[in-house]
Amino acid sequence: MSKKVEVNKVVVAYSGGLDTSVIIPWLKENYNCEVIAFVADVGQGEEELEGIEAKAIASGATECYIADLKEEMVSEYIFPTLKTGALYEGKYLLGTSMARPIIAKAQVEVARNVGADALCHGCTGKGNDQIRFEGAFAALAPDLHVIAPWREWDLVSREECLDYLAERNIPCTASLTKIYSRDANAWHISTEGGVLEETWNAPNDDCWAWTVDPEQAPNESETISLKVEKGAVVAVDGKAMTPYEVVVYLNEKGAKHGVGRIDIVENRLVGMKSRGCYETPGGTIINEALRAVEQLVLDKTSFEFREELGIKASHLVYDGRWFTPLCKSILAASEELAKDVNGEVVIKLYKGHATVIQKRSDNSLYSEEFATFGADEVYDQSHAEGFIRLYSLSSRIRALNSK
């Protein structure tokens, strides 16, 4: 966006960190506008939110709005995505990606309520988040201007940002050296930068902020029981819980046993690769439980279709296309497939592993009588011969024609 565009009031997504603390006075100086700070509570922790309203006002914001989005994020974004089976590039449970659309949506709502004519985010010009935020803004508020300071200003280092605030007597507790970049919410914590920028470097202890080192995890395993209804976990160990409560409870259990760590090199939407250490303890447990019930309930073609939906959904969510017709259609299809995904799963947690050891469902298509290797009254093994001849007919014809 050009600086020449006239802006009267802007709502900035504010985290309380160095970047967004600089953005507030920078917006006032460069756009001569009123700045409203918006803080999304997505479960990043009380420490991150403590005193954040006062900090925003001290940086120059007129007001600061804090929205508690934790329950909605899990129930309306994370759990529906889980039903698709989405795993970006086969590993990533999309912790950062799923949080962005709800943050953007809530930011737009604040902008509407205060009569703002612009939105602002603190994402860099190299990452995926700028696309996720601005893609959501385009879908939800195409009439509002969007300001992305990192694509406009001349500040290039943390030292310059700290000097910028010091020159204006704006308090900031950030340090000069920031080794790692972290993003946290109720679903996951990601860590990037530092030693991880060289792929031959093994992650050190500082690369993990949440989970116990699996080697240091308890020597005794722990089992938990999860009740699944319509593709969502509704109770753990016999206790009914809301989606957010499920995640919080399983996060504690999983982190204690070192569950949910991945070290991944992923393909960013902007074209480059990035490496990160991601921790999703509760999410890993939930995902294992849902897939276990699906194995019992979904027939072969439905299972294959769900797998296809999961791959496509992972890219749509990662690429910031949550508010598109295609994403909505995939979520709706997954919801339909999940209607019979009901059951109970027992998972063993032990030194970094979440292993399904028991599973059952009233809707199970598994039949011990059919599956047994012994004699049964239902399946005549001689019937397989005709099926195989028809199934392999095209291969047989191709071979005969090639002679």
UniProtKB/Swiss-Prot annotation:
Enzyme nomenclature, EC number: 6.3.4.5
UniProt keyword list: Amino-acid biosynthesis, Arginine biosynthesis, ATP-binding, Cytoplasm, Ligase, Nucleotide-binding
GO molecular function: argininosuccinate synthase activity; ATP binding
The protein's annotated pathway: Amino-acid biosynthesis; L-arginine biosynthesis; L-arginine from L-ornithine and carbamoyl phosphate: step 2/3
CDD domains in the record: ASS
Binding site for L-aspartate: T124, N128, D129
An annotated GO BP: L-arginine biosynthetic process
Binding site for L-citrulline: Y92, S97, N128, R132, S181, S190, E266, Y278
First-level EC class: ligase
Keyword flag Amino-acid biosynthesis: yes
Catalytic activity from the UniProt record: L-citrulline + L-aspartate + ATP = 2-(N(omega)-L-arginino)succinate + AMP + diphosphate + H(+)
Positions that bind ATP: A13, Y14, S15, G16, G17, L18, D19, T20, S21, A40, G122
Predominant localisation class: cytoplasm
A single cellular component GO annotation: cytoplasm
Oligomeric form and interacting partners: Homotetramer.
Family the entry assigns: Belongs to the argininosuccinate synthase family. Type 1 subfamily.
Protein's name in the database: Argininosuccinate synthase
